[in-house]
Amino acid sequence: MGEAYTTEFIKDNIENFKSFFTKLNKERFIVKELAPYIYELAPIKKTSVEKVIGLMALNHGNEVGGLFVLLEFLSLLDKGLVNLPGKITIGLGSVESAKLGKRFFEKDLNRCYGDVIGEGKDFQRAKVIMEAFKECHMSLDLHQTQTPSAQPFFPMTFNTKTFELIRAIDPQASIIPQKPYDQKGKGVPFSHYLVNRGCTAVTVELGTMGLDYKQIYYGVQLILKLLNYNLGKEPEEFRGSFFPKRGPVFPPGPDAWLRSDLGNFSEIKKGEVIGDYDGGKKWMAQESGFLAFPKAIRGLKRTQANENEPIYILLDRDPDYLKNRE
């Protein structure tokens, strides 16, 4: 887990993000406010780079790590330690809920993108964000997990372009390939929406929610490598791992909890006691694999109340994933 912080601290740093764009060197950058807490930033000197990069944080208001990644990146720009090769759109998503320490208001902002019609602050914010990021050719959306994560990872809509982008920014990445969302009348995550519009967009889960300096460093490195990729740098050979989904796992009974030491990418074995349910009955794993997105870990707040929903996703590690797609 990361360092402790208060909502006042987050409020202050959200305003620091905003104030950066009034303080940035106007002799080096052209700054344009596209919407509240969303800005377009371009170098004064024209470059041959035409592709626009999008950088997003706080699509979930309680996943604050991405905010500090963007602040650190802006600090490097301001100090002249990083050159901007072309135009970027950089913004914060669920700002008002972040100021309250909430994940969202009435509706998950990261399920409000696309053709879905809805009312309320979250849908209104999604419309503003979609308009602001409409010119992006590549995008990186910074997230954190609600339950412990052994490592950063990329849940991605698999296609050649998204894979090449991940390979460019982290050739040792752990990737969970996902099927494209059905957008008809439904809200979808930000990156899925952009991919469906032709943008090469990826989401990174930096790690467990909180203020973690290793995550900030990692996130900034991803952005710097993304800038280099936009300049034409070839990706390295992929040395990471694919973890395709085998399927959802439902609780064996009421009041089910996973062991306190489990989290994202924990490896479990068939027959292993992975938790308890119904007043202390042993919960035995039916299959071996790796956990993803666990919803109820003993000692942590349950992230879902409905016992009819999956309590975790079971993953495989597939060294031949790319070969099998050919």
Region locations from a protein language model:
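Structured catalytic-domain cores with a bias toward divalent-metal coordination
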Residues: 1-326
